[in-house]
Amino acid sequence: CVLGLKDYMAKNHFKGVCLGLSGGIDSALVAAMAADAVGGENVYGISMPSMYSSDGSKDDAADLARNIGAHYDIQPIEPLFVSFQNQLELEGVAAENLQARIRGVIVMAYSNSKGLLAVATGNKSELACGYSTIYGDAVGGYAPIKDLLKTRVWEISRWRNKAAAVGMGIGGLHVVGNEQGSAGTPLPDGVMIPVNSIEKAPSAELRPGQKDSDSLPEYALLDQVLAMYIEHAHGRADLLADGFDEATVDTVMRLVDRAEWKRRQYPLGPKVTALAFGRDRRLPVTNAFRE
């Protein structure tokens, strides 16, 4: 993923990246990868808190930016959200998605005004289930972790911190441009990704008390089903024979099938698994064939 981002930026003449920093694990890992690829000084992290953002998430975003030496700006979205709501008076999912789309506008404003590559931070589990906001958190020109399941995101984040603890600084990965294995720029306290970003329950923080598990099966289970359904092409009967319960199988298959239209519009990114969305797996956008 780091090499893919580094190579894409070099071949398309991008010197830096911008992304939203929510304090969550996905944006933290993507920012860390960007720092390893082009240096923290070329990463522009934007915190865009709302009335639902926790103090812990704000602190985690700031800690991540400080750890990797990134530029860090805070752009609260509540004034913009209130302006939209004064005219639109949205409720429910529409109001939640409005927050994500305001953030997307801000990220793209940084990209356009500073000549930066906007990077999307969605993972494969979210893309599979359509757990993203089109024209919101799905904006960008490149998506470094789009082929990593959520459980893999956690695994890589823990590995990167372990590597940092034993001296692998920013840019210390053995990739093109660092073939000799320079240790890179030392990290403060030997930590790259805030531990709290790794350990806390995932949440989009678009409404009070929201958790990913409100809308999706727990990731430990979800990713097992997704791996068999997507990467091993197991159908419904196969998944049931694999030991997954009927309700979970039907829910996951329905979510995946209905989200094809979103995946068609998602930014490109590296292929790191046996079967990635896009060229490897293209199903019809219309999905009534399941019925």
Regions found by a protein language model. Give the residues of each.
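ATP/NTP-dependent adenylation/nucleotidyl-transfer catalytic domains that generate, transfer
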Residues: C1-S22, S27-E291
